Design a protein with these regions (language model features):
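Carbohydrate-binding surface patches
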Residues: 270-284, 797-838
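The feature marks proteins involved in alpha-glucan
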Residues: 38-52, 78-168, 213-271, 275, ...
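Short, surface-exposed alpha-helix to beta-strand junction/turn motifs within ectodomains of secreted
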Residues: 56-66, 177-204, 284-299
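Conserved alpha/beta catalytic core and glycan-binding cleft of carbohydrate-active enzymes
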Residues: 349, 354-356, 360, 585-586, ...
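Sec-dependent signal peptide cleavage junction
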Residues: 25-40
Length: 916
């Protein structure tokens, strides 16, 4: 047969014939295809969408009518959720299942079943917390996909309250290990008792009820509870559990009821009587216990009266000077004894408070209204010092070794006849001596004659001086008087005094006087009720709680007023909150705006919200508070986390930007050169060495073991010069200037005196570096260009120069900050060879700092616009062109202008009179 068709019709016919052949072949094969039912097997497909807030490891527990139970893991996933695919031999009419964990927590209370099968396949969709079994995706997705929280249901377990805590004065949060029926009516069978007396439950609510059951609820009572009594909760099937103090301590109702604004906490002494007041709002009874001797075991009890806002008071008639005392508190029927947190002095080892006459502890020469002159915060040059380190060396020339009184000794000299002690520090030129912890701390036995050592970052009694630094720790007045003598002596020598404070933690919350007086209030706790240790050194103080914050502020103000202190360094300040720090700044500024506040602004990962932490990131929210700049520290010498890590001065390239960030005082200088946002340069504390980690000299020994001491000395000088010429506040560890070593010990907090002492012989051995240091200090003090007060001033006057790799150079122009030098160039060369940099102009330049000498006197001059910077050296030059405005001191320049103006006025006046 012949057919004649068109081209398009031929193509259509071909497709049709192919389709017919394919369908025919499939039809021929159909009899050979078997369903799962025909194959003798049953396939189960379970799709499971867990609750969004559940991180439990769910699996399937399946059983047939033959009771062959077994666990099956989810072995796939799709858009709906997890998928479990299982094959069973034989045909099934019904399959039981539970969605559960290996600990037998179930997502619903009921056993459920798959009862619909299609050709040997049973496919269902399940939603966590929902008892319904869905046989289609459309049905399961209806009504949205928001899932309720899953109450963990346990099989064969005894009911118990796993959480019972007081969140408000009349509200208890509970959580149970197994679900209980919830009707949303009445008290749900829950019984609350206070010291055995049943309280009225107003209502019980829950946001996590599923099919009439829950494990979480909130109990609201008809009245506020007495926090000093034992509160319990129980329910049929759930044994009685004591309620702990939860968020109630942070609640507005608690603060309103118990915040005490008064200034008389602690003891108030007079010869006629001493008044005592302690804050213990959760106590049902409080007693004052007095002791005649520091080590008496039994004292005299006096019942205190309940005062306002959770305080307790008692007046003890007569002169109670040098009487020791504690408080006993009864909380939930248990008596506990504690030292007064506000005690101004304590017994030996700080186990009892002491009543002292503060006026009687003033030295014969005591000028609390007078301090060394100091106006601008960035005029500070801070010298960190440990009381014992200062004088304990046999070569120190000081008699009161390891004591406060060592700071009062004059004319001390070492074995080589060289100046030591306060005379030496004064001559060095620093402005502030920062004393490492001088409050009463644990871990040193004040009654032992054996040599003991600790840095002191484990506070015991915040408002009392450390007894091991006094000549008589048994007399509570002596430690106070001798510390005042030390402060006065330093002031008399033109040195201000800063105090290192540790309000972020105490060694142990359980042993602290805070927790004994008000359990659960002064420390931070995690969700399980465990006191947090966010520093790694002890339990964290909850400064965000009003009375804890009040204590810190009161304590700082007490030290500032009573001891006439000039600054405070806050250990691990990032654990404190912004509100606490800004309140301290406000209060101190009202007393004396020149008082320094600085702190470690590291983010320690606290329970505080990020924006609330007193960290570097939030520096712009804390004006007037300075933070340690670890960027320039690590940039100069290498990371402190790796002892062998190098930095700019000791051989690591591409660290220039870190150095530049420090040079500008951490301000927001440019897109690349910035640190903590829009801050003032006064907020950057620049340093390369402190008591933590290796000394700079020890670090250089570790990072550059093959270099000789001459090379390492150059590196050391280079590092010191970067710090002292940078904008901001320079900070040094005592002895850094004479290459202090701790023998490679990077954490000498409890090492012996041999490791920690200031070895005064090093001063003589390294007198060249000491003099170099002094010269840099003199340069900084006499030239305000290195101490600009604002970010805007720095951006206007400080420009970085184009430099080779491993070189940082910059120019300060325009008589910046009213400096007498019009143009200053500073350069740091970390290379092993000399480099040349191009200057902005050609003129006569005076060199005042090089790799060997430093100061304000001209070492030599050169002309031109090229500067050769020696290897591993710093250089500072200024425009020395003959110009009256740049060669004369600024005050003479000012006088000349005034004289000129006066002459002009007189001339014009005389001319006017002659014309008349």
């Amino acid at each position: 047969m012949n057919f004649k068709i068109g081209k398009n019709k031929s193509k259509t016919l071909s497709i049709f014939l192919v389709a017919v052949l394919v369908i025919t072949e499939l039809l021929l094969l159909m009899p050979n295809v078997k369903t799962f039912a025909q194959s003798g097997k049953t396939k189960i497909i379970i799709h499971y969408a867990k609750t969004p807030n559940s991180d439990l490891k769910w699996n399937m527990w399946l059983w047939t009518d033959k009771n062959d139970e077994s666990k099956f893991e989810f072995n796939g996933k799709d858009e709906f959720g997890k998928v479990c695919v299982v094959e069973f031999d034989g045909a099934l009419n019904k399959l039981g299942f539970i969605v559960r964990t290996d600990e037998w927590r179930k997502d619903t209370v009921d056993d459920r079943f798959i009862e619909k099968f299609n050709n040997g396949v049973g496919e269902v969709w399940l939603k966590g917390g929902d008892t319904k079994v869905y046989y289609s995706l459309a049905e399961a997705s209806a009504g949205g996909s928001k899932l309720a929280a899953v109450p963990p249901i346990a099989i064969g377990k005894t009911g118990e309250f796993i959480v019972a805590k007081l969140d408000e004065m009349n509200s208890i949060s509970i959580e149970t290990n197994i679900a209980f029926p919830f009707t949303a009516k009445g008290n749900e069978g829950i019984i609350v008792k206070s010291d055995g007396q049943i309280l009225t439950v107003k209502k019980v609510t829950s946001d996590e009820v599923i099919t009439g059951i829950t494990t979480v609820a909130k109990i609201e009572l008809s009245e506020n509870m007495n926090l000093g009594k034992k509160i319990t909760v129980s329910k049929l099937g759930f044994p009685e559990k004591e309620v702990v103090l939860g968020d109630v301590m942070k609640s507005a109702s608690f603060e309103k009821m118990f915040y005490y604004e008064g200034t008389d906490l602690g003891n108030t002494y007079s010869k006629g009587k001493t008044s005592f007041r302690v804050w213990a709002p959760t106590a049902t009874e409080v007693k004052l216990v007095t002791y005649k001797k520091w080590n008496d075991k039994i004292g005299v009890d006096s019942s205190m009266k309940k005062g306002e806002k959770g305080t307790w008071t008692f007046d003890l008639n007569g002169d109670q000077k040098d009487v020791f005392y504690t408080y006993k508190v009864n909380i939930k029927g248990v008596w506990t004894e504690a030292v007064d947190p506000y005690a101004r002095s304590v017994s030996a080892n700080g186990d009892k408070g002491a009543v002292i006459d503060l006026k009687g502890t003033d030295p014969e020469i005591w000028n609390p209204g007078e301090k060394p002159n100091f106006t601008n915060l960035n005029d500070a040059i801070i010298y960190e010092l440990h009381v014992r380190d200062f004088s304990i060396d046999k070569n120190s020339g000081m008699e009161n070794k390891g004591k406060f009184l060592a700071f009062t000794e004059k004319g001390t000299k070492g074995t080589e006849g060289k100046r030591t002690g306060v005379d030496y520090i004064k001559d060095l030129g620093v402005t502030h001596v920062e004393l490492m912890p001088i409050f009463d701390y644990a871990s040193v036995d004040e009654t032992s004659s054996k040599a003991q050592y600790n840095w002191g970052y484990n506070p015991k009694n915040y408002n009392a001086p450390e007894g091991s630094y006094s000549t008589d720790p048994y007399n509570p007045s002596v430690r106070v008087k001798e510390l005042k003598q030390a402060v006065q002596s330093l002031h008399d020598n033109g040195l201000r005094v800063n105090m290192d404070v540790v309000y972020n933690h105490m060694y142990s919350s359980n042993d602290s006087n805070f927790n004994k007086l008000v359990p659960g209030y002064y420390f931070r706790y995690d969700k399980d009720g465990t006191a947090t240790n966010e520093s790694g050194f002890g339990n964290t103080i909850a400064c965000e709680n009003a009375m804890a914050r009040k204590f810190i502020v009161d304590s700082v103000m007490y030290w500032a007023k009573e001891y006439n202190l000039d600054g405070f360094r806050f250990d691990l300040m990032g654990l404190l909150d912004i509100n606490t720090m800004t309140e301290i700044r406000k209060k101190l500024s009202s007393l004396d705006p020149s008082i320094l506040i600085m702190g470690e602004g590291l983010d320690m990962g606290t329970t505080l919200l990020s924006d609330a932490k007193a960290t570097q990131k939030n520096a712009s929210k804390m004006p007037g508070i300075s933070l340690f700049n670890d960027i320039i520290r690590d940039g100069i010498k290498g990371s402190v986390l790796d002892a062998k890590a190098k930095g700019f001065v000791n051989g690591k390239s591409y660290e220039e930007t870190k150095i530049e960030k420090g040079i500008v005082g951490g301000i927001d200088y440019s897109n690349d050169i910035k640190t903590w946002g829009k801050i003032s340069p006064l907020q950057s504390v620049n340093y390369v060495e402190t008591h933590d980690n290796n000394t700079l000299w020890d670090k250089l020994l570790l990072t550059n073991p093959k270099d000789d001491n001459e090379i390492r000395l150059k590196m050391h000088k280079l590092a010191d010069s970067i710090i002292l010429t940078s904008q901001g506040i320079p900070f040094f560890q005592a002895g850094q200037e004479f290459l202090r070593t701790k023998g490679g010990n990077s954490n000498s907090y409890k090492s012996n005196d041999a490791v920690n002492k200031l070895d005064w012989t090093l001063k003589s051995k390294n007198i060249d570096t000491v003099n170099y240091f002094k010269g840099l200090i003199k340069l900084r003090k006499e030239h305000p260009a290195f101490k600009m007060n604002s970010a805007e001033m720095i951006k206007q006057n400080l420009k970085f120069l184009k430099s080779p790799q491993n070189v940082v150079a910059y120019e300060i122009s325009h008589n910046a900050n009213m400096d007498t030098w019009s143009d200053i160039v500073v350069a740091f060369n970390a290379n092993r060879e000399d480099v040349t940099i191009k200057l902005s102009k050609s003129c006569t330049w005076n060199i005042v700092v090089d790799g060997e000498k430093s100061g304000v006197k001209t070492i030599k001059q050169f002309k031109g616009d090229s500067l050769v910077v020696p290897a591993l050296s710093s250089i500072v030059i200024y425009d020395g062109s003959e110009n009256i405005f740049t060669t004369l001191p600024f005050w003479i320049y000012t006088v000349l202008i005034l004289c000129g103006v006066t002459y002009l006025i007189l001339f014009l006046k005389g001319r006017k009179e002659s014309l008349e």
